[in-house]
């Protein structure tokens, strides 16, 4: 599995602000989008381009253009919605596929409850977004679902990842790419990432 921890100063600064205990919903939501945008920039750096000729202001000019790769952004409900717009800033024509999976707070196991996926998944790059990679259960279940529908090319973007989740994800899906803003220390007994961000979904939606 390709693992990239994006260490750009802007990413580190913005993530540091998100860790503040008293951060308000508006600021947390804005920063989730901004870091999602920066992670997308990094994750799409290997997209193929081709030369095409267009009519410029002074006649024909040869330019680079993305080589017809279809993209779908896949937010995992509900917290993943907080990073979706960051992806769409760079790939505004991307289709949106939605997967609903929540974590049982007692067993920590993923429980699927909803899916609405783009067509032709086998032809698309799926960019899966979720702020936290904790145990990895929800992410693994989502990737299982996407692959069952024919998806072959997957990149995962998360704000914060725990070593335990990274290990589990690599064991289950070694062929995917994972981009994160930080690899944190560990999971606590409740399955939360330490130091982490707290409950990202509650902070994005203002329900904490």
Swiss-Prot record:
EC number: 2.4.2.9
Substrates-to-products reaction catalysed: UMP + diphosphate = 5-phospho-alpha-D-ribose 1-diphosphate + uracil
GO MF annotations, alphabetized: GTP binding; magnesium ion binding; uracil phosphoribosyltransferase activity
UniProt pathway annotation: Pyrimidine metabolism; UMP biosynthesis via salvage pathway; UMP from uracil: step 1/1
Keyword Disulfide bond: no
Protein residues bound to uracil: 193, 198-200
Regulation: Allosterically activated by GTP.
Domain of life the protein comes from: Bacteria
UniProt xrefs under NCBIfam families: PRK00129.1, upp
PANTHER family linked: ADENINE PHOSPHORIBOSYLTRANSFERASE (PTHR32315), URACIL PHOSPHORIBOSYLTRANSFERASE, CHLOROPLASTIC (PTHR32315:SF4)
Protein name: Uracil phosphoribosyltransferase
């Amino acid at each position: 599995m390709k693992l990239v921890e994006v260490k750009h100063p802007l990413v580190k600064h913005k993530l540091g602000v998100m860790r503040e205990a008293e951060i308000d919903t508006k600021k947390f939501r804005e920063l989730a989008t901004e870091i999602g945008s920066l992670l997308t920039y990094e994750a799409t750096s290997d997209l193929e381009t081709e030369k095409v000729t267009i009519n410029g202001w002074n006649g024909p000019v040869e330019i680079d253009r993305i080589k017809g790769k279809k993209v779908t952004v896949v937010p995992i409900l509900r917290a993943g919605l907080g990073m979706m717009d960051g992806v769409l800033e760079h790939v505004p024509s991307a289709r949106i596929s939605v997967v609903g999976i929540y974590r049982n707070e007692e067993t920590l196991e993923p429980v699927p409850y909803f899916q609405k996926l783009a067509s032709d998944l086998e032809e698309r790059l799926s960019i899966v977004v979720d702020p936290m990679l904790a145990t990895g259960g929800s992410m693994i279940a989502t990737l299982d679902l996407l692959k069952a529908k024919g998806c072959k090319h997957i990149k995962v973007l998360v704000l914060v990842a725990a070593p335990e989740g990274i290990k589990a994800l690599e064991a289950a899906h070694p062929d995917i790419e994972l981009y994160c803003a930080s690899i944190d220390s560990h999971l606590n007994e409740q399955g939360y990432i330490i130091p982490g961000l707290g409950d990202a979904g509650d902070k994005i939606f203002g329900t904490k």
